[in-house]
């Protein structure tokens, strides 16, 4: 029998298989590297798209906030202008009615009805006067009460001055024409007579 024997076929197959695996391992490594590079490139594209979309979203949000702020400012400005227009219209209308109130006030002070018929007429127009005053009161109109109050140039117009020892300087002695307010807004200044303190006036003349 020869010393060099042919190995069994099974052994040859195993040996050949190990050799095949050893040869194919570099190809697998190269393929894995390419896939990783492609995946990294795709991730970079996704990240870039994400950043771009985030930037666009931020810009759209900023544009929306600016638009909302502009609309709110427009709404407030329009509302304020409408309120001012309504107030000015109301003020103009009421101011036109004030002379009518003045005439009623003068009639009440001067007319002394004589007889039943005159008294009936007097009560009739006094009823109209009351209706008018109540209507003005409901929309916020109120008369000033100037007499006895310190003179206030924002409310009063001094058309007369009178020296007196009974009041300090700058007190409204008489209301010559009634002033009116619409809420806090002056509809018409009161025309008044204002005191001049006699002692202060005498001291000024002496000096």
Curated annotation (Swiss-Prot):
The keyword Cytoplasm applies. It is found in: Cytoplasm. One of its GO terms (biological process) is protein folding. The keyword Chaperone applies. It comes from the Bacteria. One of its GO terms (molecular function) is unfolded protein binding. Keywords: Chaperone, Cytoplasm, Stress response. InterPro entries: GrpE, GrpE_coiled_coil, GrpE_head. It holds the Pfam family GrpE. Gene3D superfamilies: 3.90.20.20, Head domain of nucleotide exchange factor GrpE. GO terms for cellular component: cytoplasm. Belongs to the GrpE family. NCBIfam families: PRK14140.1, PRK14143.1. Homodimer. Participates actively in the response to hyperosmotic and heat shock by preventing the aggregation of stress-denatured proteins, in association with DnaK and GrpE. It is the nucleotide exchange factor for DnaK and may function as a thermosensor. Unfolded proteins bind initially to DnaJ; upon interaction with the DnaJ-bound protein, DnaK hydrolyzes its bound ATP, resulting in the formation of a stable complex. GrpE releases ADP from DnaK; ATP binding to DnaK triggers the release of the substrate protein, thus completing the reaction cycle. This is Protein GrpE. It comes from Synechococcus elongatus (strain ATCC 33912 / PCC 7942 / FACHB-805) (Anacystis nidulans R2).
């Amino acid at each position: 029998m020869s010393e060099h024997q042919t190995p069994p076929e099974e052994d040859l197959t195993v040996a050949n298989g190990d050799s095949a695996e050893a040869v194919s391992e570099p190809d697998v490594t190269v393929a894995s590297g390419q896939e990783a590079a492609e995946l990294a490139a795709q991730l970079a594209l996704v990240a870039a798209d994400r950043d771009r979309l985030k930037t666009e979203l931020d810009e759209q949000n900023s544009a929306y906030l600016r638009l909302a702020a502009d609309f709110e400012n427009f709404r407030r400005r329009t509302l304020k202008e409408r309120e001012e227009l309504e107030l000015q219209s109301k003020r103009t209308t009421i101011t036109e009615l004030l002379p009518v109130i003045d005439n009623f006030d003068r009639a009440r002070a001067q007319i002394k009805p004589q007889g039943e018929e005159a008294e009936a007429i007097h009560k009739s127009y006094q009823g109209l006067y009351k209706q008018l005053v109540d209507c003005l009161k409901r929309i916020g109109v109120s008369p000033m009460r100037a007499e006895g109050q310190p003179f206030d140039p924002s409310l009063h117009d001094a058309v007369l001055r009178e020296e007196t020892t009974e009041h300090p300087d700058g007190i409204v002695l008489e209301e010559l024409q009634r002033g009116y307010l619409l809420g806090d807004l002056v509809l018409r200044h009161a025309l008044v007579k204002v005191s001049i303190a006699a002692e202060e006036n005498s001291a000024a003349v002496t000096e």
